[in-house]
Amino acid sequence: MTLIPIVVEQTSRGERAYDIYSRLVKERIIFVTGPIEDNMASVIVAQLLFLESENPDKDICMYINSPGGVVTAGLSIYDTMQYINPDVSTLCIGQAASMGSLLLTAGAEGKRYSLPHSRIMIHQPSGGYHGQATDIEIHANEILRVKKKLNQIYEKHTGNSLKKIEEMMERDKFMDPEEAMKTGLIDRVIAERKDMKIENIKVKQKVV
């Protein structure tokens, strides 16, 4: 059983206790830790939407330490990151593998980071199905469709050609932060907080 620390704050109404993750959400910090699955994705999506409602112009920071997980759950987080108004900066702590690497790469341009000793891994989606030949063919085609969609997302956020993305994604590809930066998965490797560029107010483009 995982022990979650409790933080006690003094307020004008007395003491108030938060679990550590809820307290960090108040600072606009969201954690993506462990396998990505539907329940976790629902919580993260809710946090993103809540923080947007609190302040639609202030950055949200997402810390990622995940081996990956369910593609549909990860894409629900990805779509919400793109949907909301605030910039979402991403930071890899530990590892960002599979869907974790996609979320890391999906951060706002110029605000995708990794700590020095993290690792990033990308690969194509996998799956298995037992049943009649026709059903197996249906599921195989779906996996190929998802593979194409994920490749297009990496292409969009890294600036690499689709052909290069397909080559990199063919097998498990592990990278240190420096290689991930050269590949376009992140923008910067940071060792200290002062190196992290977080904008309090998102600069809106003027329509002329």
From Swiss-Prot:
One of its GO terms (biological process) is protein quality control for misfolded or incompletely synthesized proteins. Belongs to the peptidase S14 family. It is an enzyme of class 3 (hydrolase). InterPro entries: ClpP, ClpP/crotonase-like_dom_sf, ClpP/TepA, ClpP_His_AS, ClpP_Ser_AS. It comes from the Bacteria. GO terms for cellular component: cytoplasm; endopeptidase Clp complex. It comes from Wolbachia pipientis subsp. Culex pipiens (strain wPip). Its EC number is 3.4.21.92. The keyword Protease applies. This is ATP-dependent Clp protease proteolytic subunit. Fourteen ClpP subunits assemble into 2 heptameric rings which stack back to back to give a disk-like structure with a central cavity, resembling the structure of eukaryotic proteasomes.
